[in-house]
């Protein structure tokens, strides 16, 4: 029996993706470096399905239909390169290697170029949705060698999640574009999770809500504009009790881990000069949470305001305001994410399909939500939309949410409740809508101490301050008039 495609890596994600493909009528060849894993999988979960095993890499390759389609679901980094180097000598020109792991997009760029020279087609595909998504329909974000797409399109779109009947999978773009979009997806995921945690913290510490009451609030929100996977699971987590009848969430150490994809997004935003502030703050919030011992010490020596029992006088209005704050901040997070994708496309020379990207995230993935349907609609109406905030639906939504957004942050700040993600979202919004920012003074400072020059406003131009010219002023009368390009502030 020949397989439609093969998959290497039989951890839970790999097994579930194979089972998903078999359910959709595809024959899959499974391989793992530990043979016992293959044997156990074939004898149990895969029994009776169109799944075959292989005893070696050579045996694995020999069982694939041409062009061979090899999907890797192994740990990102060196293991991917090692496996590719092992497989390539056994392949022919036109065969396809698909990396479905959480690889960093520069690695995918490199692999794309290296394999291109050897005539091998490379696809770097983001896979989102966790174990359940892999089994019943993930969000898939493939990019790389576009010649590979006709050969894998039917498989990928068949096994992917569906939203309103459309597959949550479409070709993203060349080189590492697929893994880039997955990286931004993960960064937005960081932001969404942090915003939800801040809403939980505000309700608990400021409103005195119990976990069950907060769960009820999230349940209500999940029936409205905030309907999403993360709000849904938060509802479930907060009502889950341990064996002693107490909320399990209260027993969990308040130190958050991270695998690095949020950090990658924040660093890339800095590299491209994009103010993706919310994802950055979400990453730093996790870093701060890791300083548990220092925070315990600081809590004993650094004073702050006490929260009075009557801090929240109208619970219903308080919850409504907080819902608006969460909704508006979420809009900012996605606006920033798509700003970054837009800039990446321009910088890296990629032609990316924003409506398709939004649709891919509409179902099957961790950030899936009803909200993404509006983003898909916005980009379908205007594919070159500069910013989501210029779309009438989102502009109106933020305008309507402003009052509750500002009140929630002001109240939390008054009583010392940290809101890094909420606050940076609002600061970005206020900065973005400001025709004039204080960067004029900043640029004057740079010119004063480093001769970095500045430009004048067209309406302020004169003979000594010409328009569209880099100008340096001798601010003290003691310096020179030579512009510096070596000392940067």
Curated annotation (Swiss-Prot):
Gene3D superfamilies the UniProt entry points to: 6-Phosphogluconate Dehydrogenase, domain 3, N-(1-d-carboxylethyl)-l-norvaline Dehydrogenase, domain 2, NAD(P)-binding Rossmann-like Domain
Disulfide feature: none
List of residues binding NADP(+): 9-14, 32-34, 74-76, 102
InterPro entries in the cross-refs: 6-PGluconate_DH-like_C_sf (IPR008927), 6PGD_dom2 (IPR013328), 6PGDH_C (IPR006114), 6PGDH_Gnd/GntZ (IPR006113), 6PGDH_NADP-bd (IPR006115), 6PGdom_BS (IPR006184), NAD(P)-bd_dom_sf (IPR036291), Pgluconate_DH (IPR006183)
EC numbers, comma separated: 1.1.1.44
Pathway(s) served: Carbohydrate degradation; pentose phosphate pathway; D-ribulose 5-phosphate from D-glucose 6-phosphate (oxidative stage): step 3/3
Substrates-to-products reaction catalysed: 6-phospho-D-gluconate + NADP(+) = D-ribulose 5-phosphate + CO2 + NADPH
Assembly and oligomerization: Homodimer.
The protein's role, per its UniProt record: Catalyzes the oxidative decarboxylation of 6-phosphogluconate to ribulose 5-phosphate and CO(2), with concomitant reduction of NADP to NADPH.
Misc remark: Present with 101000 molecules/cell in log phase SD medium.
The protein's name: 6-phosphogluconate dehydrogenase, decarboxylating 1
Organism: Saccharomyces cerevisiae (strain ATCC 204508 / S288c)
């Amino acid at each position: 029996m020949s397989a439609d495609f093969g998959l290497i890596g039989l951890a839970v994600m790999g097994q579930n993706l194979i089972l998903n493909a078999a359910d959709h009528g595809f024959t899959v060849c499974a391989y793992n470096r530990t043979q016992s894993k293959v044997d156990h999988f074939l004898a149990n979960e895969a029994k009776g399905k169109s799944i075959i095993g292989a005893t070696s890499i050579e045996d694995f390759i020999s069982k694939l239909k041409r062009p061979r389609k090899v999907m890797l679901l192994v740990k990102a980094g060196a293991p991917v390169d090692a496996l590719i180097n092992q497989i390539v000598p056994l392949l022919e020109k036109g065969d396809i290697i698909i990396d479905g792991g959480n690889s960093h997009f520069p690695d995918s760029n490199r692999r794309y170029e290296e394999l291109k020279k050897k005539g091998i087609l490379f696809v770097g595909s983001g896979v989102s949705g966790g174990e359940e998504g892999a089994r019943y329909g993930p969000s898939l974000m493939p990019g790389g060698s576009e010649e590979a797409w006709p050969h894998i399109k039917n498989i990928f779109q068949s096994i992917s999640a569906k939203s309103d009947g459309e597959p949550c999978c479409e070709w993203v773009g060349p080189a590492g574009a697929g893994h880039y979009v997955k990286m931004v997806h993960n960064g937005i995921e960081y932001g969404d999770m942090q915003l939800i945690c801040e809403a939980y913290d505000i309700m608990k510490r400021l409103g005195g809500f119990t976990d069950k009451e907060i769960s009820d609030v999230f349940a209500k929100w999940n029936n409205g504009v905030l309907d999403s996977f993360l709000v849904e699971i938060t509802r479930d987590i907060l009502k889950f009790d341990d064996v002693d009848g107490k909320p399990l969430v209260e027993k969990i150490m308040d130190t958050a881990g991270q695998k690095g994809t949020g950090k990658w997004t924040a660093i890339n935003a800095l590299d491209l000069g994009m103010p993706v502030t919310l994802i950055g703050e979400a990453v730093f919030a996790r870093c701060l949470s890791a300083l548990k011992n220092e925070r315990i010490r600081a809590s004993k020596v650094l004073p702050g305001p006490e929260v009075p029992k009557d801090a929240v006088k109208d619970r219903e209005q308080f919850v409504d305001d907080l819902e608006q704050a969460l909704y508006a901040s979420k809009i900012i997070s996605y606006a920033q994410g798509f700003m970054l994708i837009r800039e990446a496309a321009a910088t890296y020379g990629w032609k990316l399909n924003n409506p398709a990207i939004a649709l891919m995230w509409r179902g099957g993935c961790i950030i899936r939500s009803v909200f993404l349907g509006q983003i898909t609609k916005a980009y379908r109406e205007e594919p070159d939309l500069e910013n989501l905030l210029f779309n009438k639906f989102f502009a109106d939504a933020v305008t309507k949410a402003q009052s509750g957004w500002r009140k929630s942050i002001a109240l939390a700040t008054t009583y010392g409740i940290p809101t890094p993600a909420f606050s940076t979202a609002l600061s970005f919004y206020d900065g973005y809508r400001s025709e004039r920012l204080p960067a004029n003074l900043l640029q004057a400072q740079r010119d004063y101490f480093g001769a970095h020059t500045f430009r004048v406003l067209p309406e302020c131009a004169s003979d000594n301050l010409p328009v569209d010219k880099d100008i340096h002023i001798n601010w003290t009368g003691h310096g020179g008039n030579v512009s510096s390009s070596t000392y940067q502030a």
